[in-house]
Amino acid sequence: MPGGLYYPGGDSSRGTTALAIECIDQQSIDVSVLAIAAELRHFGDLAQQVIRQTERRVIAGEKLPPAEKIVSIFEPHTDIIVKDNRDTFFGHKICLTGGGSNLILDCLIVQGNPADSTLPQTMLDRQRQIYGRYPLKAALDGGFASKDNLQDAKTSGVKDVCFAKKRGLKVADMCRSDYVYKRLRRFRAGIESGISWLKRSFGLWRCAWKGFASFKSYVWSSIVAANLLTLSRRSTPT
């Protein structure tokens, strides 16, 4: 390469980009140009990571864990979300907690793609941190169901725990009666309709803001807007 520079292990495009950035760093004193160089360096590093992961997966046949994959050079924080054997999504898992008031009481935004079964106790603990106690009743999605999660919830003081899918659990172990279990299951269905409302009316189906911090801000702004509308409807005379 010109000037005797050599970039081992890299193709010509990577070497050319690195050389251009080096020349800018050495010769430019213009702040705007240096900012462009920093941006080039950022995307150049991400591009090299994409090339390396492609070489490992496609050429070497190596299976990479999701945490090591870059699926977007513009939003590198994006996680690969796999729901059972269904569709694959890109973004972040969001766990919402709602109450009888129809308000969203809490939101847990998770990085990575942890199994749903690892999340319930964290959500319950957050309720205790916010309100000073654990809820007396809890209705959760079927993906959260496990004997350990049921035991942890009961130990925390939750009297009735309803998982939408039993997954081998007995109603008698979860709730005091079939009646309570059915009531909680219907309540959880109402939470699902609230989530659909957030997606349809408040843009929660897709985030258009850049960066993980902005992603969290976008999610919370949608939730706050929905809660404010719910409160205003309750306070409006009919």
Each predicted region: which residue ranges?
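Polybasic low-complexity intrinsically disordered regions
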Residues: 1-136, 140-142, 150-152
